[in-house]
């Protein structure tokens, strides 16, 4: 919000002076951001905003990870203290599932070190692990059938993400030596 004053110095013409009375807050910035979003992108933004709230209520999680700004995208990255890899949490509205993985940037050797322990990693995650190797990046990936489009499933999804992210951090600490 602006306030306009008219100033005059001596015999000069009056000139406007603009004073900022109120600056935009995060709410107005968020509103500008979401104006052009699709329904699916709005859902993603709401989902990750809710995840940030769930994260802040979990002491084990907040000791290990820092929240980042919720964005209207299908992934949410968590730093685990290495520039070589991070934890990626994903939602898939088309397949009605969610996933979590260690995402390794351009380091096949590191991926192979983890893969040497694939049975133990699968046991730790209590899940069948998909070992995805691509040209630039590799992923140690798991999914579960929780539909991110159904808001009543979100608490279950958040709990799954919180649990699996902590386990992935334990995996990284144990096998990245």
Which residues make up each language-model segment?
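Tryptophan-centered motif/residue detector
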Residues: 18, 27-28, 48, 75-77, ...
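Mixed-charge intrinsically disordered linker/loop segments at interdomain junctions
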Residues: 1-37
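Short, surface-exposed, charge-dense and proline/glycine-enriched linear segments
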Residues: 2-8, 31-34, 93-102, 156-170
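Short secondary-structure transition/capping segments
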Residues: 20-26, 110-113, 169-177
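Polyanion-binding interface signature
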Residues: 33-147
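Ampiphathic alpha-helical segments that act as solvent-exposed interaction surfaces
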Residues: 116-126, 146-177
């Amino acid at each position: 919000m602006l306030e306009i004053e008219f100033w005059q110095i001596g015999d000069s013409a009056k000139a406007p002076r603009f004073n900022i009375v109120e600056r935009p807050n995060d709410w107005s910035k968020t509103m500008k951001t979401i104006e052009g979003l699709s329904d699916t992108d709005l859902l993603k933004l709401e989902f990750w905003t809710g995840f940030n709230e769930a994260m802040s209520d979990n002491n084990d999680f907040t000791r290990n990870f820092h929240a980042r700004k919720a964005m209207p995208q299908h992934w949410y990255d968590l730093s685990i203290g290495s520039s070589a890899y991070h934890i990626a949490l994903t939602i898939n509205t088309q397949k009605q599932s969610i996933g979590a993985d260690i995402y390794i940037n351009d380091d096949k050797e590191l991926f192979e070190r983890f893969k040497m322990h694939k049975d133990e990693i699968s046991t730790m995650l209590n899940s069948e692990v998909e070992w995805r190797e691509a040209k630039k990046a590799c992923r140690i990936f798991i999914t579960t059938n929780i539909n991110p489009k159904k808001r009543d499933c979100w608490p279950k999804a958040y709990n799954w993400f919180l649990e699996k992210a902590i386990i992935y951090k334990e995996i990284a600490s144990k096998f990245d030596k």
